[in-house]
Amino acid sequence: MIPFSLKNGTLCVEDIPLPEIAAQYGTPCYVYSHSYLTERARRFTKALDGAGKGKSLVAFAVKANPSQAILASFAKEGLGADVVSAGEIRRAVHAGIPPERIVFSGVGKTAEEMRYALEIGIGQFNIESVSEIEMLAEVATSLGKKAAVALRINPDVDPHTHAKIATGKADTKFGIAAEDALSAYEKLASYPSLKIQGIASHIGSQITDLAPFEAAAERIYEIITALEKAGHAIETADLGGGLGVRYKDDQPEPPSVEAYGEMIKRVTKGWNCRLIFEPGRSLIANAGVLLSKVIRIKESKTARFVILDAAMNDLVRPTLYDAYHEIKAVTPSAQTYQADIVGPVCETGDIFARNRSISAVKADDLMAIMSAGAYGATMASAYNSRPLVAEVMVSGNKSALIRKRQSVEDLMRDEQKVEWL
C-alpha cells in the first residue's frame, strides 16, 4: 500500500488529511501509518517462509523505532525483537513480545544487562568478543542458568553503504573476525553455563544491493560447516538486517522484500538450522513522516530559507549522515522555488535540505519530511531545551496519540536543586 498520498490536492496519511492531524495534535509531530507497517511485517514474514529449518524468526530491530504502539503492532504479527540494551528488552516485553523471541545484540552488554536478560529468559545472546563470553559465563553461573549463545562473526564484507552504518567490515567494532571463529567457539564450549546455539552476522544498514547479503551468508555457511566438522552443532543462523529503502523519489526501487527472500532461500538451501533476521528500517522507514509547520520564509542575498518548527533535534539524520529525505508541501501549489529548508536550532548544521526545488510554501503552511519512520523519533534529543515532539498512529480514518508532546517542565522534572548554590 501507499501510506501517504495526495487526495483532492492534500497530502493524506491513509484516509486522514495531514492538516487534520496538525489541527488535532499540533506540530511538529511524527505520524505513522499502521496499515503500512503491518503490511510490511506480513510481507517480510511471508517472503522468508520456508527458508532454513523450521519457521524463521523475524526480529524487529528495536533501535529503529522503539515506540510501544509500533512494537505492540509487530508483536501481534508474530515478530520478535532484536535489542541492544536492557531498556530495549523492557520495551519489547512491555509491548507483548515474548522473551523467547528476543535476540540480544551489541558490543557493550554489561553484567547487569546480562543478568536481567537471563532472568527473564531471552531467546539468544549474540556475543561479540571473547571477553564478553567470559562475562556472560560468570553471570550465568552466578544465577544457576544456562545462556543460549550465538557468536557474531564479522565476515569482512563491504555493504556499499554509508561508512557510519557499515558494520560488517574488518575495521569496525562489531563481531569476531572470521579467522578467529573456531577458537572462539572452542572457548564458548568450555563453559558449562553457556550453550552453543548459533552463529550471527550483520553487515550494515540501508543496503540496496543483494550481493553483499549473499556474500555474507556464503561466508557464514563456510564457518558453520567448519564448526560442525569440529563437533559444534549450530541450531540458528542470524543473518541480520540492513535491507534498504528508497528515500528519493527519483531513485530506483531497492530490492523488494520478496527478492530478498528468494535470494535467502536460494543461498540457504540445505542449511540445517533455523534462520533469524533483524529488519528495522525496511519495516518502518516509509511508514512515518515528520509533520512540520513553516514559521517564516527568510530571504537573503545568497539564499531563500524555509524555516520550519521542526529541527535537527527532532530528526538528526540529515545532519548526522547527510541523509536525503523528500520534503513535501502538504497542500502543494503549481508554483515552485529553490530554498534551503532549515530548523530554528542555533546550529548551521540544522538543515533538512539545501537548494531544494519545492512547492512555493509560505508562513503557516505544512510540510511533511518523508520516510522518517526509522531512526527519527528514536534519535531525537531535547537540544536547545526543545521538548520531544508528539507521535501519532493512523489506521484508516482513525488516529491516536501514541506519545504525548513533552513540556519544558517535563525536561526539568528530574533535575535536582543544590542547596549550597
From Swiss-Prot:
Entry annotated with the keyword Disulfide bond: no
Matches recorded under InterPro entries: Ala_racemase/Decarboxylase_C (IPR009006), DAP_deCOOHase_LysA (IPR002986), De-COase2_C (IPR022643), De-COase2_N (IPR022644), Orn/DAP/Arg_de-COase (IPR000183), PLP-binding_barrel (IPR029066)
Residues bearing PTM N6-(pyridoxal phosphate)lysine: K63
Enzyme Commission number: 4.1.1.20
Alphabetical list of CDD domains matching this protein: PLPDE_III_DapDC (cd06828)
GO MF term list: diaminopimelate decarboxylase activity; pyridoxal phosphate binding
GO biological process: lysine biosynthetic process via diaminopimelate
Binding site for pyridoxal 5'-phosphate: G242, E278, P279, G280, R281, Y375
Catalysed reactions listed for this entry: meso-2,6-diaminopimelate + H(+) = L-lysine + CO2
Active site residues of this protein: C346
Pfam families: Orn_Arg_deC_N, Orn_DAP_Arg_deC
Named cofactor requirement(s): pyridoxal 5'-phosphate
Membership in a protein family: Belongs to the Orn/Lys/Arg decarboxylase class-II family. LysA subfamily.
PANTHER family per UniProt: DIAMINOPIMELATE DECARBOXYLASE, GROUP IV DECARBOXYLASE
HAMAP family in the cross-refs: LysA
Subunit field text: Homodimer.
Protein name as catalogued: Diaminopimelate decarboxylase
